Amino acid sequence: MARSRRHSRSRSRSRNQCQRRRRRTYNRRRTMREKPRHSRRRRVRRRGCSCRRCSRRRRRRC
């Protein structure tokens, strides 16, 4: 019984570490987003649709 308890405890600890790591990466991504890189994203949006049919016809509207 002691062994099973120890095992479950270690599993929970590893899960917590993973969550912490994930949170850190998310924060890093957020800071990257906040840097002035919005112009590129807007340009992509302005182009409009990106589905196969429109890209084949060199036309950006469905």
Swiss-Prot record:
This is Sperm protamine P1. It comes from Planigale ingrami (Long-tailed planigale). Its main location: nucleus. Belongs to the protamine P1 family. The keyword Lyase does not apply. GO terms for molecular function: DNA binding. Testis. Residues 1-62 are annotated as: Disordered. It is found in: Nucleus; Chromosome. Protamines substitute for histones in the chromatin of sperm during the haploid phase of spermatogenesis. They compact sperm DNA into a highly condensed, stable and inactive complex. The keyword DNA-binding applies. GO terms for cellular component: nucleosome; nucleus. Keywords: Chromosome, Developmental protein, Differentiation, DNA condensation, DNA-binding, Nucleosome core, Nucleus, Spermatogenesis. GO terms for biological process: cell differentiation; chromosome condensation; spermatogenesis.
